């Protein structure tokens, strides 16, 4: 009897992460990005057999008309072999920036991700604030002189239930 030339990979067990579970649900995101105030809606849910937390971010319908529209899908997962979080960003800026994955480690109530983009490193930190039940997303990039600068500093609060 001949054995098949390949074997079907089995899906890993569901990824259970109590920390990431805090992000499940609907959120209101506000804060500065590149000197302008952002007003976004965020929805997070487990997808793909609980292998990823899909985070859908988009400009809120109630945002000022002057705000530049933005939309992104973030996929947060965990690589148990490498013992690190993985963050994949897909957004309106296209495929060039989606080529780079962010890798992160959890420290206390934060996950600090490093993205090594072709034009320089970029940091994204997700910080859970248990005392208020909110999140902070801090995004930083290096300027031309090699100094870290804030790109965005967002606060996420639970969205009010829709009437």
Question: What residues fall within each predicted segment?
Answer:
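Bacterial N-terminal signal peptides
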Residues: 1-5
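Hydrophobic small-molecule pocket/channel-lining residues, especially in calycin-type beta-barrels
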Residues: 6-163
